[in-house]
């Protein structure tokens, strides 16, 4: 009992001394609370920063897609065919070719989400080779995929969503005959093919299923 009295007396004396000298310290619980608050604030700042970056990239992607689409149609449509692109390297070369021709800037040819050039594939229209083209944007998260498709989908008559960081010619199908089925959330979700169930944002199933699968995703936006 005497020992407890001595301990309490020492604690009281120390607290009084700390108050007088201004050296009052923080308890472990107080430290934990402060660190917890700092962690929550930091997480919030990171989240807001990421949203700001995504929003900026989304705006840039829409601008770049529009610029490249205009450049492709103005440069090649009157020629009757688009340059053949057998693989991803050729698709990148086609994008770089537009830069070399002065049709777009190097920055306009880039995928803002990856910092690399967007791939531009030529693909069939009604079984005729190289009559259509698709601009691909890869390396997308599911959220980025959904936002990009819903943001710029009206600019293009053909949209194909693919799981994976890259696309290939074989993934695209045919501009005129590949039937869209937006209810699947992947593959061709918008097309001019008869019988297509094109993406409709007023259809809840289409919205829920959009960009179904595992990230990363690649979206191909096509025209002819």
Curated annotation (Swiss-Prot):
Gene3D superfamilies: TcpA-like pilin. The chain crosses the membrane at residues 26-46. Keywords: Disulfide bond, Fimbrium, Membrane, Methylation, Transmembrane, Transmembrane helix. The keyword Disulfide bond applies. InterPro entries: N_methyl_site, Pilin-like, TcpA. It is found in: Fimbrium; Membrane. It is a single-pass membrane protein. Disruption phenotype: Deletion mutation abolishes Vibrio cholerae colonizing capacity. It also shows loss of observable pili. GO terms for biological process: protein secretion by the type II secretion system. Induction: By ToxT that is required for tcpA transcriptional activation. Mechanistically, interacts directly with the tcpA promoter to mediate activation. Disulfide bonds join 145-211. One of its GO terms (cellular component) is type II protein secretion system complex. It comes from the Bacteria. Major component of the toxin co-regulated pilus (tcp) which is a type IV pilus essential for bacterial aggregation and subsequent colonization in the host small intestine. The leader sequence region and some other sequence particularities suggest that TcpA may represent a novel class of pilin, and imply the existence of a novel signal peptidase. This is Toxin coregulated pilin. The gene is tcpA.
């Amino acid at each position: 009992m005497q020992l407890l009295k001595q301990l309490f007396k020492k604690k009281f004396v120390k607290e009084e001394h700390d108050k007088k000298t201004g050296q009052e310290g923080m308890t472990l619980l107080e430290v934990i609370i402060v660190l917890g608050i700092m962690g929550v604030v930091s997480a919030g700042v990171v989240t807001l920063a990421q949203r700001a970056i995504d929003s900026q990239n989304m705006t840039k992607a829409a601008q770049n897609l529009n610029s490249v689409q205009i450049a492709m149609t103005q440069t090649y449509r009157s020629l009757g065919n688009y340059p053949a692109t057998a693989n991803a390297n050729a698709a990148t070369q086609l994008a770089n070719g537009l830069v070399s021709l002065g049709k777009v800037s190097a920055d306009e040819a880039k995928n803002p989400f990856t910092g690399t050039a967007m791939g531009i594939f030529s693909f069939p229209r009604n079984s005729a080779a190289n009559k259509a083209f698709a601009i691909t944007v890869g390396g997308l998260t599911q959220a980025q995929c959904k936002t990009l498709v819903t943001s710029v989908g009206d600019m293009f008559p053909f949209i194909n969503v693919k799981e994976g960081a890259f696309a290939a010619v074989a993934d695209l199908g045919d501009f005129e005959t590949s039937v869209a089925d937006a209810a699947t959330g992947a593959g061709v979700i918008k097309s001019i093919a008869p019988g297509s169930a094109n993406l409709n944002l007023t259809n809840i199933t289409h919205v829920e299923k959009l960009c179904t699968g595992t990230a990363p995703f690649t979206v191909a936006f096509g025209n002819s």
